[in-house]
Amino acid sequence: MHLKILYRGSLISCNYGCEYCPFAKRQQTAAELNLDKQQLQRFVDWITQHPQHQFSILFTPWGEALIHKHYQQALAQLTQMPHVNKVAIQTNLSCNLDWVEDCNKDTLALWATFHPEWVSRQTYVSQCLELDKRKVRFSAGVVGFPQYKNEIAALRQELPSHVYLWINAVKKELPNLSPEDKSFFSSIDPLYHLNIHHYPSFGRSCRAGESVISVDGEGTMRRCHFIKEPIGNIYHQNWQEVLQER
């Protein structure tokens, strides 16, 4: 079996303070971070204990994970496992990058978001170039607010041409975008048009819950982050039995 997992632990803190983010500049206690660390290690151990399956794992933390060493170590461990096909993580790229040398770079990938209100373009591009130099796969991206168009245009010019630069469309802002705004974002991201629609998925079957699941720090399985109803727990013996088309 090849199972794709979206992992989101109990981390809910970030070193950036973006106004649209509920976890902006939020801090956690040492005890809370230690709980997240323990949960993450349990998850890594669980992956280790199931070599008969293939896994692809995407970390989508509520906050910035890579400023914490336990996430760096977890990615290094997971990427070295032969039954793990890919390990990717969402990040603002504010961490030191030396840890990537402990990873299998054929398996590692970073989803790196530029926050022009919190970091200079020069600093962000420098981090991207460092990743490129270290031969780490990554994509760069920006939330699609029109006020940052000049920064986004400059970013595209300064990044290597082979680096994909995506625009994360803000659905609730789409009615306020001018045709020129949409044209600009499409010129930066050739896949932008796919991100500006609400797709009619309600009530339709999909692979979520069958070959793709989300997992939280306690091991609770859900079809995805957007469907809150639990379907099982990876730490229970019958976890495979709940995987089915829905």
Label each region the model flagged.
Residues 2-38, 224-225:
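Canonical Radical SAM [4Fe-4S] cluster-binding loop centered on the CxxxCxxC motif
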Residues 16, 27-30, 66-68, 148-150, ...:
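Short catalytic/ligand-binding loop motif for oxyanion handling, primarily in non-cytosolic enzymes
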Residues 40-60, 68-155:
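Radical SAM/AdoMet-radical enzyme domain recognition
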Residues 58, 88-89, 139-141, 164-169, ...:
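A structural signal for short, well-ordered beta-strand segments and their strand-loop junctions
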Residues 62, 170, 225-227:
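Short, well-ordered beta-to-alpha junction loops that form the rim of enzyme active sites
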Residues 81, 106, 134, 161-162, ...:
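Structured helix-beta-strand junction loops
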Residues 101-111, 156-203:
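Structural recognition of alpha->loop->beta junctions
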Residues 175-246:
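Accessory C-terminal segments flanking Radical SAM cores
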